[in-house]
Amino acid sequence: MIETIRKLAEAYGPSGREEDVHRIILEELKNHIDGYKFDRVGNLIVWKDGKSGKKVMLDAHSDEIGLVVTNIDKNGFLRVETVGGVPPHPYVGQRVKFPQCTGIVYVEGETSQDMKKNFSNLSFDVMYVDIGASSYEEAQKVAPIGTFGVYDSRFMQNGDFLTSKAMDDRVGCAVVIEVLKRLNSPNNTVYCSFSTQEEIGLMGARVAGYDIMPEACIAIDVTASSDTPKAFKRHAMVLKKGPAIKVKDRASISDRKIVDKLIELAEESGIPYQMEVLTMGGTNAAAFQATASGIASATVSIPTRYVHTPSETVHLDDIKNCVNLLIEYVQKGV
C-alpha cells in the first residue's frame, strides 16, 4: 500500500488535470473492479457489484492544489495564481513542476526594505516563478499562460510517517483502492468516485452524485491535525489515533445515522477512531448532500500535518484503520 501512496502522491494532477492520477488508479484496480467510466467533467467512477441491490458510494478527490501561469514578463519570469485555496507562504523558495519545465518561486524586491515589506505582506502580486528562461518567447514555449503547476516534492518515509505533496487527497484515493482490493463479493454494490476539481469548489462531486444516486456516500479526505507545537488547540485530531469520523466542518454537517453507524462498527470491530469537528474548510460530502433531493453523506478523514504544503504528513496506522472501517461500513452500514 505504501508504494501505491507514493505513486499517487508524486503524480502530477492539479485541479482539472487529473488524467495521470486516474491512469495510476486504473492500473492498481486491474482485476479488482467490475467496471469503470469517465463522466463529462473527468470524474473516474468505478464499481464492484453487490447482491443486495443497494448502492453505497465512497469518494476521494483526485486533484491537488497548484498554480496557474497568468502572465510572462519580457525576461521570461512567470506570474501565477493559485489553483485551490492555499496561501502564498508555503511556495516561497519551493520548486514548482509544470508539464514541460520546473521553476523556483520567489519574492520580488528592489531594496531590502522592499523585500521586508513584501515578505511581511506576502501575496502572489509580489511573487514570480523562475524557470531559467531569458525571454518571453523562451518561457512561452514551455509554460504558456494557462499552464498548471504543482509542488515538486518527493515522497518520504520516516518509520510509519509518510510525507509528500498531495497527500490531500491521494491518501484518500489509496484508501479507496485498498478497500476495493480487499472486498470480495460485497453485500452492497460499491461505487467509488475519484472526483475532479475538489480544490476549487467540489466541482466533480456535484456531478458524480447525480450519476450514481446511492443510498449513502462517504467522502474520504484529509483533516488538519493539532499535534504539533502550538497547533490550533480547538481541533482534537491527531496522528496515530485512528481515522477521524467527521461531525461538522464549515461546509456540511455529516449525516447523523452514518456517523452513529461508523462509531458502532468501529467499536464492535476494535478499530481505533477519533471524532472530528473542523472549524474550517469542507469536503465533497457537502456537494453530495445537495445533490437532487439529497444523498445521506458523511466524511471519514485521515489526520494530516502541514496540509497544503509540499510536506503533508500522515501515519500508516491511521490509513490502515480507515480501510478497515470503510470495509465494515460498505458491507454492513446500509
Language model features: what each stretch is:
Residues 1-334:
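N-terminal hydrophobic/helix-forming segments and targeting peptides
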